[in-house]
Amino acid sequence: MEYREGLIIVSACEAGEVFEAVLRGKSDTELRRIASFYDYLEIMPLANNHFLLDNRTVRSEESLRHLNRRLVQLGQELAKPAVATCAVHFLDPDQELLRRTLLAATAFAAPGQAIPPYYRPTADLLHHTPYLGP
């Protein structure tokens, strides 16, 4: 990629190609090929992807845990950090209403989202991912 130098490329949330490839059960070879492009892999709290349970893409919270564990494993295989993030779309929880209002007329509206995408400190992220270990 011509302009990649100096950039940090992250794998993104469930809409990113790495998570999507893990979700779709791509082969280990294909997963490594896709993930090798990124500098680090993002892990979201389960509640961020709870909609995948609601729309029946996955069957259980354990399935969501498995997806995150696979992302961590993939990072280890490629010597890339897997980082707990929270897909921040606004800074403070009280800004959620403004964001929902702006999204209401778009295809991206997500009523009833379990965890609004505001900034969460490290302690909160660790609280939501104990199954990944220390």
Annotate each language-model stretch with its function.
Residues 1-134:
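Phosphodiester-processing cores and adjacent nucleic acid-binding clamps
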